[in-house]
Amino acid sequence: LGEDQRDGYKAQKIAFNINAYSRITAYLLIPDGGDGKFPAVVALHDHGAHLFIGKEKMIRPFFIASEKQDADGKISEKKKAANQEILDDADAWVNQLYEGQYVGDYLAKHGYVVLSIDAPMWGERGRKEGVDRNKYDLIAGNMMMLGRDLSAFMTYDDISSTEFLASLPMVDAKRIGCVGCSMGAYRSWMLSALSDRI
């Protein structure tokens, strides 16, 4: 969808099918150079009762043309303001909780391919509907009454993302890890237990 060259690596915004019915966007970071395959990391964002951003907590956000322009190709002031809100929010989050360091960007600069997605209801998978914590609680509660679990859906998405990452030509599928803090640590624990790729 789009690309941003950074210091020692490139950031891509991509889309892929998480299952037969759902296509999601993700950030993918790829180190520059290298003749062989790179080790890789699935970067899993936290909860923090903050659903407005997801993958942007792990990888410094950037915006592709369709996120900046109107249908006629002109820069949209409304989209520009929305993008700035996302960037400011992500920077504030990372400064407050990660000492100003985007974990995914750090790993890419040190030779890892990094993939990060939004968990269901976070970031782009929830922002359009409005980020209301009460909606999250209602949906999670209703799923439990139906014998379903939102964290199981997250884990399924994380496993599918790992399979996608392993399929990329620049990735050494035998050297994939995962990282996350708080809910991201829980997701890492579940992914490590349920995926043979980790």
Please provide the spans of the model-predicted regions.
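N-terminal cap/lid segment of alpha/beta-hydrolase-fold proteins
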Residues: G2-A40, I75-K79
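Short, flexible loop/turn elements at secondary-structure junctions
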Residues: F16-A20, I30, D46-G48, M121, ...
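Short amphipathic alpha-helices and their capping/turn segments at secondary-structure boundaries
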Residues: A26-G33, G104, M190-A193
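Cap/lid segment of the alpha/beta-hydrolase catalytic domain
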Residues: G36, L44-Y156, S167
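Loop/turn elements at helix/coil->beta-strand transitions in domains of secreted/extracellular proteins
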Residues: K37-A40, H110-V113, D172-R175, D196-I198
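Primarily recognizes the serine-hydrolase "nucleophile elbow" in alpha/beta-hydrolase
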Residues: S160-I198
